[in-house]
Amino acid sequence: MKLQINGEARDFDSPLTLAGLVDHLGMKADRVAIELNRGIVARDQWPQTNLAEGDRLEIVHFVGGG
């Protein structure tokens, strides 16, 4: 399955959920926000949000500082 993540085309095995994608990419769920096809998806919806061929995702990492 081809997905576009932050403007880059990537191939993944399907089926895949948003939670599975975050895990696969080695990201910490509490430190990212995800936009799927131009809509923000709440973190509690990630486990039941299935991804499909051609989906476009923007993943934003939160960085602390001060």
Predicted regions and their residues:
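Ubiquitin-like/PB1-type beta-grasp interaction modules and other compact soluble beta-rich domains
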Residues: 1-65
